[in-house]
Amino acid sequence: MMRRLVSYFVRSRFSLHLSTTPPQRSALFSHILSSHLDSIQINKKISSFSVHRFCSTTLLNPELEITRIEKVSEDQSLVYCNENDIRTKGSNHAVGILHEAIMANLNAYDDMEKALDESSVDLTTPVVCKILQRLQYEEKTAFRFFTWAGHQEHYSHEPIAYNEMIDILSSTKYKNKQFRIVIDMLDYMKRNNKTVVLVDVLLEILRKYCERYLTHVQKFAKRKRIRVKTQPEINAFNMLLDALCKCGLVKEGEALLRRMRHRVKPDANTFNVLFFGWCRVRDPKKAMKLLEEMIEAGHKPENFTYCAAIDTFCQAGMVDEAADLFDFMITKGSAVSAPTAKTFALMIVALAKNDKAEECFELIGRMISTGCLPDVSTYKDVIEGMCMAEKVDEAYKFLDEMSNKGYPPDIVTYNCFLRVLCENRKTDEALKLYGRMVESRCAPSVQTYNMLISMFFEMDDPDGAFNTWTEMDKRDCVQDVETYCAMINGLFDCHRAKEACFLLEEVVNKGLKLPYRVFDSFLMRLSEVGNLKAIHKVSEHMKKFYNHSMARRFALSEKRKSTKLRGK
């Protein structure tokens, strides 16, 4: 029984209820019934009518009766309402309410169960099946709803609901192998007429699952001729915990660990899975508690564990919690988990985004004092993070601070900074940064000029692009293929085809190899302006690099298109 998967593991029992008793109708049906009765217009000339029961006695009010018209006038049309109409409309209304609550709380940290409880919708098997059908491509969300529905009063899953859930878990594009464990347990119960699965049987199922599907460990051990010290079932157990955590059922996953840890010894990966689960649902207190328990158990968290958690908290805006975890990492962490420049970069960006400039620069000094030397990736992460948060002034201060401490930025750092400014079309800031590069005697590279040229064309400023081209000649920076491509594309976009054809001819004369996609786009542009001579010349040039027959056929095709366009 899948709806009690978690409680089975927690209580070491697996109860299967296949009750076929129809659920009670909700008060919603009565409301819809009243609306239907009010909408029926009865002709005053009705001569006679007979009384019939509306439906079976399973309605809330079995004494309710409805008049059934025997005779009406010829010019009157009568609207009938029956039990199927009421059931369908009521079911659709309930499905709409539940689906809206689910869609509004899709994230793992959202309390979907609370939102569903507040919807106050009485569950029926058709309603549950319709919700599962709508969530057939979101197996994690579907399983989360299925688990919630199974714990509601006055409702129990019927076989059709189990079939829907099993089909979703086994037919999605992710092919989650974890749920094959559930299939094995259901098969065991069916074949042995059991309502309880023993712990020993569960361990045997996990062991067989590991041997059948997690074969990479055994293959590695056989190839290297080593003995695997870990229990084979712990790998399958960790995968099951991971599935629960990804579905937002972290509390149930931790309860499962508490019940099973005396039979299956947890490893570091077990704690990491639950730790990431608490971070995913944004519960730092329980995450820190589990981390302390992990250390007490003799497992040393790796640096990746801390970095992933800090990054998760920072993205969620929980900077104080991330700072507490960072301090815990320094004070109680081991040498293996000591903070690196990447960890400092995450915290620096988070503090800058939350307008904590003083703490940000204090952390920079702390990074230098601990011996974490900044590298290119550190500059890149910090500058990109600050610029994306529109903290350009703080990014400049960061460069000044690092320069004062003896770590001046290089051309790669400046280019990372410049790329963010150019992508956000901040022309003044980009030119200011370029002037700063020149003043600091950091020679701009060809990538620097390429970004400036692309930015000017995006800002519809071809003169600025030509000035950048001239600046390259003054500083003896040779243009590469990307420079020519940026200039030619920009000139075509600005409807300056003559200058674009001139540069394209220069590409041919220099013997530069154009990327085939760019070559294809240039031929299309030349075809639009009707320059057949340039088409043939570029095609002949590209024969040196690409398939001759393909280039010839493409050129002839473009020639015919150009001739046809000119004829119109």
From Swiss-Prot:
One of its GO terms (cellular component) is mitochondrion. PANTHER family: PENTATRICOPEPTIDE REPEAT-CONTAINING PROTEIN 3, MITOCHONDRIAL. Residues 1-55 form a transit peptide. It comes from Arabidopsis thaliana (Mouse-ear cress). PPR repeats lie at residues 233-263, 267-301, 302-336, 340-374, 375-409, 410-444, 445-479, 480-514. This is Pentatricopeptide repeat-containing protein At1g73400, mitochondrial. The keyword Mitochondrion applies. Keywords: Mitochondrion, Repeat, Transit peptide.
